[in-house]
């Protein structure tokens, strides 16, 4: 039994060695996962990838869409050396290429969002010989307004604090200005009173001298 096993094991070992030398790699896709955008605005559907194979002319990118309320999958965009926009359908004249394959970026830009754009967008990248891998997904929610987040509240708080500081500085500067002006007015008034008293005193002295001369 054991004497015959090497003939059976040898092909298996060779196949394992070949698999180890030439492993099957997969393209990894990265997306935001979930995204909210306001109705009527434009949104960037970001999709990046990593691949063990160098990016070349064989790279292909396929974007598809499945509505949230169900229905068949719809074509959104295709890229192979050049971008190919949809010639018909809901995304005609509403989607443009916004990626850079050399930087592993295959994002697209969707214009003039509508409420029926709610759904899941898929991003599939093939970079031969890396053709396997999971498809990236983005769940887009089109809303009337984007709810305030902590970042917005923080920005409002910082802006309010800066405005308050500016107001305080202005009040202090104005207070110092009017205070100096008031002291200057008081000094001028005191100087004027002193001058009048000196003038009266001089006139009194002149009268006294005149009376003495008359006598």
Swiss-Prot record:
GO biological process terms on file: cell-cell adhesion; T cell differentiation in thymus
Leader sequence segment: 1-26
Database matches in InterPro entries: Ig-like_dom, Ig-like_dom_sf, Ig-like_fold, Ig_sub, Ig_V-set, MPZL2_Ig-like_dom, Myelin_P0-rel
UniProt note on tissues of expression: Widely expressed. Expressed in the cochlea, in Deiters' cells, possibly at contact sites with the basilar membrane. Expressed in both outer and inner auditory hair cells. In the stria vascularis, detected in the basal cell layer. Not detected in thymocytes, lymphocytes, macrophage or dendritic cells.
Topology with respect to the bilayer: Single-pass type I membrane protein
Family note: Belongs to the myelin P0 protein family.
Pfam families for the chain: V-set (PF07686)
Role this protein plays: Mediates homophilic cell-cell adhesion.
SMART domains assigned: IG, IGv
Subcellular location per the Swiss-Prot or TrEMBL entry: Membrane
Name this protein carries in UniProt: Myelin protein zero-like protein 2
Extracellular side, ranges: 27-154
Biased composition (Basic and acidic residues): 187-201
């Amino acid at each position: 039994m054991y004497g015959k096993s090497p003939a059976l094991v040898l092909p298996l070992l060779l196949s394992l060695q070949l698999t180890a030398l030439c492993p099957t790699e997969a393209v990894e896709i990265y997306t935001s996962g979930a995204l909210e955008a306001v109705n009527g605005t434009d949104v960037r559907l970001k999709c990046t990838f990593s691949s063990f194979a160098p990016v070349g002319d064989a790279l292909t990118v396929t974007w598809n869409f499945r509505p949230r309320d169900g229905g068949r999958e719809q074509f959104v965009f295709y890229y192979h050396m050049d971008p190919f926009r949809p010639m018909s359908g809901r995304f005609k004249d509403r989607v443009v290429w916004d990626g850079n394959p050399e930087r592993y970026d295959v994002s697209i830009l969707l214009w003039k969002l509508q409420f029926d754009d709610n759904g899941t967008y898929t991003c599939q990248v093939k970079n031969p010989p890396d053709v396997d891998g999971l498809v990236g997904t983005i769940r887009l929610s089109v809303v009337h307004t984007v709810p305030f987040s902590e970042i917005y509240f923080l920005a409002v708080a910082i802006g309010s604090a800066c405005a308050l500081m500016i107001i305080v500085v202005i009040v202090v500067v104005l207070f110092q200005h009017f205070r100096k002006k008031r002291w200057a007015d008081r000094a001028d008034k005191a100087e004027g009173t002193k001058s009048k008293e000196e003038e009266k005193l001089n006139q009194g002295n002149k009268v006294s001298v005149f009376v003495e001369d008359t006598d």
